[in-house]
Every structure is written in structure tokens, then in C-alpha cells.
Swiss-Prot record:
It is found in: Cytoplasm. Its EC number is 3.1.26.4. NCBIfam families: PRK00015.1-1, PRK00015.1-3. InterPro entries: RNase_HII (IPR022898), RNase_HII/HIII (IPR001352), RNase_HII/HIII_dom (IPR024567), RNaseH-like_sf (IPR012337), RNaseH_sf (IPR036397). It comes from Chlorobium chlorochromatii (strain CaD3). Belongs to the RNase HII family. GO terms for cellular component: cytoplasm; ribonuclease H2 complex. It is an enzyme of class 3 (hydrolase). Endonuclease that specifically degrades the RNA of RNA-DNA hybrids. This is Ribonuclease HII. Residues 14-206 form the RNase H type-2 domain. Transmembrane segments: none annotated. Pfam families: RNase_HII (PF01351).
Length: 206
């Protein structure tokens, strides 16, 4: 992947920020967002960065190898987490918006333009933005944000797995696999589970 999408925009915007999130679907843990700004007119000359794509299309090893390259080449990057209890309070959509906005606010600069993966974004920031469906497959800065968010969240869930070993978080990162649902059936929910995410498989009213 290259910066073909950003190139015409750089004529008008100096600091273009790609934003993506991971963790909307899991039954446990936080939603994590990343914001990445590459230098104006950046071209990925490092061979590793040309492999950059939607994090879901990369292996865990590929994602992890990309993280130091992204951080080294980016002008700025930031991560933000919104925890399970906040997700239960405000709903997953609002929690996702909060995470993405907080990632932008954590940057040391004010971006000129936000490029957001997906088709929906709300913000109180006075920054123009574009939503891009499948942006993590087409836009370099969004793909970079996707990788940073995914690797960060997977690492968090591996830490949680040591505290709550019955659930296999290190294998499924909290997503509703059959093994995860069976673990909830046997052991109940643990403190990092999203209480508002109900399961038909357990006879819960959705």
C-alpha cells in the first residue's frame, strides 16, 4: 500500500490524520482507537511498510513487525482506550466515537484533516473530516492506525488472560467464539466483560 489517497489531499492539508478503531464486537475488554499522522508527501520506501493493509488481513506476526516501522516513520501517533464499563454506560457506538476523538486529542498537534475508517463519525473538534468505507484497505494512514490499535488491544487482552485464565482471551481477544461463550456459560462473566452485551446462546434477551 502507498499514500495515493493522501497525495492530492496534501496539496490542501498539511497534517492528515488517519483514524481507526478495534474492539467493537468483543464481549469483553476495551475498544481501542489509534490516530496516525505521517509527514506531508510521505512515501513508504521501507519494504515492510509497503505490506501495510487492513490489520484483519495481516497475520499477528506481520502486524507486530509493522508497529515499530509505523512509529518510526509517523510524524505523530496516539492511542486511546475506552473501557468496558464506559461501553456499558454509553453504548458501543458512542464509546467508539469517544475513543477515536480521544486518540486525536492525544496527538501533540492539531490535524488539518481527519480520515476516518467507516461511514460514521461524530466529533466536537473543529477539524474537517472524511469517512471512508474500508478505509483501512485503501488509505495508508488509516491502515497504520488499524495496525497500531489492533496490536495494542491484543496485547491488553493477553494481559487480561493472565488475570482471568478461564476465558482464553489470549486466543480470541474477547470476541464471541464458541469457546468463549462456553466459558461464560461455565464460569459466568468476569469483571472485564461488557454486561450490556447479551447472548442468545445463553438464553439472554438481546
Amino acid at each position: 500500500m502507498h499514500t495515493h489517497y493522501e497525495e492530492p489531499l496534501w496539496q490542501h492539508y498539511e497534517f492528515i490524520c488517519g483514524i481507526d478503531e478495534v474492539g467493537r464486537g468483543p464481549l469483553a475488554g476495551p475498544v481501542v482507537a489509534a490516530a496516525v499522522v505521517f509527514p506531508r508527501w510521505f512515501q513508504p520506501t521501507e519494504a515492510l511498510l509497503t505490506l501495510l493493509n487492513d490489520s484483519k488481513k495481516l497475520s499477528a506476526k506481520e502486524r507486530e513487525s509493522l508497529v515499530p516501522a509505523i512509529k518510526a516513520q509517523a510524524l505523530h501517533w496516539a492511542l486511546a482506550e475506552v473501557q468496558h464499563n464506559v461501553i456499558d454506560e454509553v453504548n458501543i457506538l458512542q464509546a467508539t466515537m469517544l475513543a477515536m476523538n480521544n486518540a486525536v486529542k492525544a496527538l501533540p498537534i492539531i490535524p488539518s484533516l481527519l480520515l476516518v475508517d467507516g461511514n460514521r463519525f461524530t466529533t466536537d473538534l473543529a477539524i474537517p473530516y472524511k469517512t471512508i468505507v474500508k478505509g483501512d484497505s485503501h488509505v495508508f494512514s488509516i491502515a497504520a492506525a488499524s495496525v497500531l490499535a489492533k496490536v495494542h488491544r491484543d496485547a491488553l487482552m493477553c494481559v487480561y488472560a493472565t488475570h482471568y485464565p478461564h476465558y482464553g482471551f489470549e486466543r480470541h481477544a474477547g470476541y464471541p467464539t464458541s469457546a468463549h461463550i462456553e466459558a461464560i456459560r461455565q464460569h459466568g462473566r468476569c469483571p472485564i466483560h461488557r454486561q450490556s452485551f447479551k447472548l442468545r446462546q445463553l438464553g439472554e434477551k438481546v
